[in-house]
Structure formats: C-alpha cells, structure tokens
Amino acid sequence: YFDNQLVFVDGYGQIKLFDVTNGTEIWSTSIEYPILSPPLIYRGYINFITADNRIFSVDILNGEINWSFQTISETKKNLFTSSPVAFENTIIAPFSNGELVAFIFDTGQPVWSENVSKISMISNFDIKDISASPVIYENSIYSLSSNGKLVSVSAINGQRNWAIDMSGYRTPVISGNQLYIINEDGKLICLDKNSSEVYWITDLLKYRKGQKAENLNLWLGPYLINNLIYNISYFGELKIVSPITGDILSTDTIGINGVLTPPVILSHSFYLSDENSNVYEFK
C-alpha cells in the first residue's frame, strides 16, 4: 500500500496497481517467473524476489521494469521468501541461497553481499533460504537463515558485526538493546543485539504432543505488544512471555486452528487468518 494505491503480486508473475478509493486498476503487467516475496515499495519503485532467485525493480508509475538482478538459483527452497528491505539509498534482498545483497535502489548496482547460511561441505541438499525478513535497526541488519546463522551486519558496507549458530523462519523483533527470536526448535530467545550475548531462553515447545510432523506448533512471533511478548501456534495456542525474565505469564487458546500467516496488529486489536482464508479480529 502506498499513497492510496495498492500493489498486488502473485505466484503467476502478475503485478497490478489499484486505486484503493474506487478499486480501479491503474496498470497491470506480468513477468514469466512466480513471485515469492511480498513487494517493497520504496522511492517510486516496487521491489520483489522471484522463484529463480532474481530481484526486480518496477516503476510504480507505469509498471515498466527498471532493473533486475539474478544470483545463484537454489532448487531447494521454502515456498515463500521474505521481502527486501530498504536502508537509505539501498535495497537489501534476502535470497534463497542464503545471500544478503545490497543494491543502489534506482540503478540496481550491487554494493555488498553477505552469506547468512552455514556452508556445508557434506550436503548440497540443505535449505539455505532466508525466510525471516531482515530487520534494520539503526545502522545494522539482523538476518536469520533457515539453515545456519543469525547474523548482524553493517547496513552501510555489509561488514559482519557478529554471528551465532541458529536456524529459524520467523522474523526477529528488537526493543532497546534486546533482540527476541524464535528458532526452529520452538525456543524463544532473548539476546543482546550488540554483542549476541544470550540473556534467556524459553521453550515454547516445538510439538503440541509427541514428535510427529502433524503436531508441529509452527510458532508465529515474537510480537511485542504493550510490553509483553505474544507468540501464536498453528493450533491457536497463545503464550504471553515476559520480555524481562522470559517467564511464560499465561497460556490460552484463541479458538482457531490452522494459523499460518502473521497477524496484522493495530493499536487496540489484531487480525488473524487461518488456512481456510477465514479472518478473525481479536481485541
């Protein structure tokens, strides 16, 4: 959404721009590649990543391609990828081979790159994708890969600040000097964003029961709301955690099942959708 205009992209390669006041389609175009990431609108351009590990920059005025760049493609990847992010005059893209690459926003000139994924000398079959959206705080970028590392790098030149072994799919959240993140084992971790020192770890439980795939909790979060950390499972379980101590303050069931997409959070309510496309409001 930008300036009363709504950008639509999909897995068929369609890109459309609508006027939100009356629903009129302003322009429509398409590319031959499925679009896997949400779009980023920045300084007059729409940026997104496609299934062949390519980033596109499209002019929001007319839908014409401004530039594109392709890095090494990966056959093993997640169904969706995270969105590019913007920092000053650069667009930073997370690719499915574990690379973060920064580009000049209007020319597509690469500025720097950093690999977030752990390099395996044994297997080429690991998923290296970056499913968690990179987070920019001050002059640093924090990024988590599906197989390998949580890293902090300079948004200016890509120089690595620190890295720790951790894998996951959920976007971290930062408050003050603390970074909160859920790893692939369903553990909520609080660490120092400057040094990577771990303050506490809380086990949200990877499985609802047993260890079968159908019982994976697939936690969404963390979400910092009113100075509390909210975490929501696929089965509709809500766990509220203290950001200071990591203690689980409450566990409740919100009454819906099949929660896969992150909520939309407003000032006094949040909205969730389930795998059947039903939308729910919670206050």
Predicted feature locations:
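Extracytoplasmic beta-rich repeat domains
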Residues: 1-3, 25-43, 65-88, 110-138, ...
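Post-signal-peptide, soluble extracytosolic/periplasmic N-terminal scaffold domains
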Residues: 1-11, 17-19, 28-29
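Structural signature of WD-repeat beta-propellers
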Residues: 3, 10-11, 50-51, 95-96, ...
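Short loop/turn segments that connect beta-strands within beta-propeller blades
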Residues: 19-23, 59-63, 104-108, 154-157, ...
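Loop/turn-rich, solvent-exposed surfaces of beta-rich toroidal or solenoidal domains
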Residues: 178-193, 197, 201-240
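C-terminal closing repeat unit and adjoining cap/tail of repeat-based domains
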Residues: 195, 228, 233-277, 283
